[in-house]
Amino acid sequence: MEAKDRLIVALDVDTRDEAISIVNAVGEHCGLFKVGMQLHNSAGFAVTEEILSMGFPVFLDLKFHDIPNTVGKAATVVSRRGVKMFTVHAAGGREMLRQAVKGAREGQGERRSGGPLVLAITVLTSVSQAVLHDEVGLPGSVEENVVRFARLAQAAGVQGVVASPQEIRPIRAACGDDFVIVTPGVRPLWAGTDDQARIMTPAKAMEAGATYLVVGRPITAAPSRAEAAKRIVEEMAEGLARR
C-alpha cells in the first residue's frame, strides 16, 4: 500500500455540500474518507452512498456501543452499504465485539463482495491520563488500557483498532504486524493541535507502525486542501521509508 492509500481524510463538517467539496478537492490525494457522527447525523447515509458512488472508499466512524444484538444488526446494515471500515467501542465487551464481526460478515455475504473492517475504539485521543483516572474511573495508564482493549478486540475477531500515535508500538508488540491500527491525533508541525491530547506528526506515526492515519482540520481547514493533503502524504512516505 502506498502512502496516499493510507491517508483517511475526516469529513467533520455539517453539510453534504461541504463534504463533497472536500472530496472533490482531495480525492486523488488520499485513500479513504471518514464519515463520522457530525456529518452522518446531518446528511444521513445519502452522503456516504454519494461518496461511494464517486468511487471513493468510506470509513464510517459511528462508534457503535450498545447491547450485542443491536450492535450486530447495525453492523449488518453498514456492511450492506459497502463501507470499507466501521467502528465499535471496545468497552462494550467481548460479546458485543463478536456480534459486530458476525454482523459484518452477514452483511458481506448478502453483498457477495469484500466486507468491511471492524475497528475497535480503545481510548479516545482527547482523553488524557487525568481524565481516564479522575472522570472515567479506569485504573492503570492510558497505554495499559489501550493495549488491554486491543487484545480484547483481537480475541473477539476484530481486525483492528483506532488508537492514538503514542500507543502504536505497544499495540504492535501485543497484537502483531497484521493487526490494523488506524491513528487519529496526527498533526504536521505546520498545523495546530486542536482538541487532541495525544498527538504526533504524520512521519513519526507511520514510522511507529500505523496502518492508516486520520487527518481532518490540517487538510479541510487549509487554504489549499489539495496541497495540504499532498504535504501530509509526503511526510507519511518519509515515515514509511524509515520503518
From Swiss-Prot:
Residues reported to bind substrate: 12, 34, 61-70, 125, 187, 196, 216-217
PROSITE patterns: OMPDECASE (PS00156)
Entry EC number(s): 4.1.1.23
GO cellular component, one term: cytosol
CDD domains assigned: OMP_decarboxylase_like
Pathway the protein acts in: Pyrimidine metabolism; UMP biosynthesis via de novo pathway; UMP from orotate: step 2/2
Family: Belongs to the OMP decarboxylase family. Type 1 subfamily.
Record's protein name: Orotidine 5'-phosphate decarboxylase
Naturally occurring in which organism (per UniProt): Heliobacterium modesticaldum (strain ATCC 51547 / Ice1)
